[in-house]
Amino acid sequence: MNKLIAIVGPNASGKSHIAVDLASALGGEIISADSRQVYRGMDLGSGKTPVSERKNVPHHLLDVVDAGEFFSMADFQKLAYEAADDILSRGKIPFLVGGTGLYVDSVTKGYLLSDVEPDLKYRDELEKLTTPELYDMLMEKVPDAAVDRFNRNRVMRMLEKLHDGDDIVPTASPRYDVLTIGIYREREELKRRIDERLTRREAEGMLEEVRGLREQGVSDEFLLKLGLEYRYITEYLTGVWSSEEEMLNELALAIKRFAKRQMTWFKRDQSIVWLNMNDKPFETALTLIKNFLEAE
């Protein structure tokens, strides 16, 4: 079975940077597993690794569709499989890197996904509920679901998948033999890094990025449904928040809550090898990967 390396962790943990270093050292290529990085023009808000920091490591599944277009987990899985198989065919190592738990699991666990038409009657019932009501409904079924409470589209899709069974998605035999490395920080350090990253991205033009998307015709509805940075900034630009400072403070709190939920989601998987970034884990991770690749 072909082998794949997954690097996961919460927002601001440093997983993308260590993944670039590892891929660079091992001749690998990175497949982004982030539900917002697939959109063109959504760079700062989604946290794409700048080209200048990619060390010439090829990155896949960035800028796949225009902002505003529909993109499903099934779309992601299909493209991720294609990218991984292409990387392997060229004798390279695929690194699946990201914090969107369902996207990661769809590849590493081999979810059975299809483009079957949704149950429109059930969808109509869901549409009648507010976003908080939908989120509470999901939490009753899957308390550790790593999803932004304001991302209405994703919450609804997860509820639809739960409608006909007990699991979010059925699992087939995985396509790849996978080593998953989890990257984490101590809680207070992660919170500090989230604050610093948000301040840096705001200074780099994150608000202007969202303004530009709106000027290009990307709907407020779409931006609001994406949650976190895009939701809060869109709310600020439409007068929901009284000041930029208030908005950024509330956004920072929301990102911290989401990072906690990401950790809860990933910690369900007992196969993940966790490494603390404070321990400078590059050499440890490199050894783990080399041993995994060399094993029969």
What are these regions (language model features)?
Residues 1-296:
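Phosphate/pyrophosphate-binding catalytic cores of soluble transferases and nucleic-acid-acting enzymes
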